[in-house]
């Protein structure tokens, strides 16, 4: 076991108290993780923190995005104040894509891979209206102009036959509306080569050709 110790100067404003114990604030914790933890892990922490602070709602998306942008700017300002710290480039890349609209760690990791591949930025949880069924679907990640989507599937999503039937109807409806998509599982996330091939196969060759890896998100 390798034990590493690091000494950092901690401003009083970055310390709070929980159950009588001194701990770092939510935003400071997000920053420390963005600097020191692999991006596929720190993005989950950053997304979760933004979701807790913003409390986004689908029917007030613009207001939710505004609150998220305000918090993200604060994180970026504090990050630049620590720019000499090791891991700054990685931290910038993580904070830049942090979003309150990710609904699970699996979605966050999937988006980290998408961004690391250099693909166009996806829209999280956009509404796709189905006029026939009179319902709105919300894919996890989507590229509306291309009618491409990615969905993360955890086991809890399919606990009953009703869940399976509802998901089948959803997939059929999106296909009928001209959308193409892939469903990503934890097994895919544990196999980056397979996952990347799965994602890239969805996109037109010209977009794949223009894509450039983002090394800060592969660290």
Sequence positions of predicted segments:
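Short acidic-hydrophobic surface loop/beta-edge motif
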Residues: 15-16, 126-128
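Short beta-strand or tight-loop elements
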Residues: 118-120, 124, 137-139
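Active-site glycine- and acidic-residue-rich loops that bind
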Residues: 100-103, 132
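Residue-level signal for threonine
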Residues: 25, 104, 160
